[in-house]
Regions:
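Short beta->alpha linker loops
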Residues: 23, 46-50, 86-87, 108, ...
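Short, structured helix-loop boundary elements
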Residues: 48, 70, 85, 89, ...
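Ser/Thr-glycine-rich phosphate-binding loops at phosphate-binding pockets of nucleotides
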Residues: 16, 20, 106, 170
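N-terminal helical cap/lid subdomain that shapes the substrate entry/recognition surface
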Residues: 2-98
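Asp-based, Mg2+/Mn2+-dependent phosphohydrolase catalytic module
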Residues: 1-7, 93, 109-111, 115-217
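Conserved SAM-binding loop
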Residues: 17, 84, 102-105, 139, ...
Length: 217
């Protein structure tokens, strides 16, 4: 840790800040049943991937199908429930009180996030410092680009950053960025992610600035 640089906390969004992953699993499982019945548990298969990655891998050349899926997804995201992961707001407020910079670093696009801001304007009004979306980086998770951008916008170094992630791709990206990674067992089990993070937690209840700083040593 470089004490001449600020500390930054970089949060994935779905399954880390908002309790949305279960809803997405239902949506994508239905898409999988319709278009890829040979791939069971399609929702789990595409976790942590951008829409572009999903289309490139599973719907390449299927322009009409992509348009239909996107339209359905946009409707779904307008109507989905947006509830915070337990304890995350209090944790963010604790971080801000101690001068920690906070960014949401998400594979979601601006269209989806506009729905989020409408429901939770506090995200744009001081709860976090920056929100980095899929349009802002060339390579998506598991590449480290998004988290490295998080460090860059705050003028700090990877060793001063803590990443909070739930998906395998996100955990891999945080590690590839050379950052301390905390795993949320909201999407995958604690057992499944334990080797991919320095600490796994079920939510943010009881987690605070001091506990985070202890991970940085």
């Amino acid at each position: 840790m470089d004490k001449t640089k600020c500390i930054a906390a970089l949060f994935d969004f779905d399954g880390v800040v908002m309790d949305t992953e279960t809803q997405y699993t239902v949506y994508w499982d239905e898409v999988g049943r319709q278009y890829h019945p040979e791939l069971p548990h399609f929702g789990a298969l595409i976790k942590g991937q951008t829409l572009t990655q999903i289309y490139d891998k599973h719907f390449a050349g299927m322009t009409e199908e992509q348009s239909k899926i996107t339209a359905r997804l946009n409707r779904f995201e307008r109507e989905m429930t947006l509830e915070y992961i337990a304890g995350v707001v209090d944790f963010m407020k604790d971080l801000r009180a101690h001068g920690v910079k906070i960014a949401i670093v998400t594979s979601s696009n601006e269209l989806k996030m506009a729905n989020v801001y409408a429901a939770h304007p506090e995200l744009k009004e001081g709860l976090v410092d920056r929100i980095l979306t899929a349009e802002m980086f060339t390579r998506s998770k598991p590449a480290p680009d998004c988290f490295l951008l998080g460090a860059e916008v705050f003028g700090t170094l990877p060793q001063n950053c803590v990443v909070f992630e739930d998906s395998f791709h996100g955990l891999e990206a945080g590690n590839a960025a050379g950052m301390t990674v905390v795993g949320l067992s909201t999407t995958n089990t604690a057992e499944a992610i334990k080797d991919k993070c320095k600490l796994s937690i079920p939510d943010f209840v009881g987690f605070n600035y001091e506990k985070m700083m202890a991970l940085l040593g």
